[in-house]
Amino acid sequence: IEAGAVNPRVLECRRLTLWRCVQVSLELGLPIGAAGQLWILPFKNSKLSRQAGTEQVDAVPVIGYKGWVSLLGRSGLTIKTRLHYEGEPWEWAEGSEQTLRHRPDDNVRLSVIQELGDQATPAAVEQIMNGLVRHAYSIATTPSGLTTFEVMSRAELDTAEAMSPGKNAPDSPWRDPLAWPRMVRKTVLTRHAKELPIAGNQAAERAVAIESHLEAGGTINDLPGLDDPEADAGQESPGDAS
């Protein structure tokens, strides 16, 4: 219900896919909705739409930035993510010893606000600031004090955005200048999560598996490990399992 209040199109999704999203929520221990931990986004199922002759919409679970922080925190990891903007001092070197130095500069944002003048709405400011992003990075610290980094360049972020399912949908968070910073922070954190020590953290391991499945072109319909109430009742509809 809360997901439908945030995005009414969710209520148009096929019930089986909504049920599978609820299962993912329960598996990961992440609430659905405005808390930003797990979102349900509607995506058109082109194959079923052609078969049915009417638009068929699937619900897809999307782990939010706050969801990843919660999942990784269960392994005792402390997580930070930041954005590096054009004009801010920056040094990043890989090798036997990683080096990351970033000095945030509030004057970058202040300059944008001054340039916009009376038109400096939050969305207008973020629209320009988003264009100035040059890197996104995450920092993870283990309970033993080991710190690791993950850095994505602007080119990598743009590629991730271009490959995101539903990126061009009217309600895609990628198209919202206020949501875009959270999306790129989530993107770099998702990539970092695949390299972090999460053995024994079943929810985090499952989250990584789900993200990898969807990134590889899989769908909620063929995601392994989910119960299918229609199949259990012997009433599975054609196409629901593929």
Regions from the language model: what does each represent?
Residues 203-242:
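Glycine- and charge-rich intrinsically disordered segments
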Residues 1-199:
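Binding-interface segments
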